[in-house]
Amino acid sequence: MYIVGAGCGDFDLITMRGAEYIRHCDVLVYDSLIDVSLLGFAPETAEKICVGKRSGRHSEKQENINEILVEKAREGKTVVRLKGGDPFVFGRGGEEIETLKSADIPFDIVPGISSSIAVPELAGIPVTHRNLSRSVHIITGHTAQDTLPENIKKCAETDGTLVFLMGLRNLPDIVENLIRNGKSEDTPVAVVSNGACAKNQTVRGTLSTICENVKSAEVVPPAVIVAVSYT
């Protein structure tokens, strides 16, 4: 059993180790938020199971995914669980390895390039900057209840870079809460859609303008929201 991060965006951002495991798998259990070219790495005889995991589209419940992993592993097959980005950055990889541990199924983990760092970077936005931003905070843009995280006030108080994942739909609420809790309306913000892909789009503004800018540009998910403490 291999828990593999596919990286963010184009297929060639996967690690060499991750690609090699896919080439030798019997079963490939994959998220929809990956480059479909990666499916071609698997043997023709491999069973390929899509479990979704994309906002606004049908996805298997996490419990069902866990059951699939255990079932296929107990059949004696080499299983690759291919997850978008990095398995442990809002990827629920921790829940999956807990299930595997409980079932006494050995596993290996292959990290992936996370969109939280790579997408801003590819847009020319460093998440840390000497003497200007000494920390970076990676925050979910929505919870299971489709609400903002409870620590949004602390996010507003930090001088570090804020990176929100899966938060495009909640952008107005994120902006409102940051301003209400003390973040300057002039704080630079960027929203990067489909980062690390050929069709990527970057929209820039400030907390006071970004919502209107994003609406005018018709930005679509997946998107990463970055608020920086420098210009």
Question: Model-predicted segments: where are they?
Answer:
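Class I S-adenosyl-L-methionine
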Residues: 1-11, 16-110, 118, 211
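A contiguous loop/helix-start segment that scaffolds small-molecule binding in enzyme catalytic cores
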Residues: 1-3, 75-79, 135, 144-229
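Class I SAM-dependent methyltransferase SAM-binding "motif I" and its flanking Rossmann-like core
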Residues: 10, 86-158, 201-204
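Short, solvent-exposed amphipathic alpha-helical segments in soluble enzyme
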Residues: 17-21, 43-46, 96-99, 124-125, ...
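Cofactor-binding loop segments of dinucleotide-utilizing enzymes, especially the Rossmann-like FAD-
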Residues: 33, 141, 194
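Short gly/pro/ser/thr-enriched loop/turn and capping motifs at secondary-structure boundaries
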Residues: 36-37, 55-57, 114-118, 136-137, ...
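Short hydrophobic/aromatic-enriched beta-strand-loop microsegments
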Residues: 46-53, 106-108, 127-134, 182-191
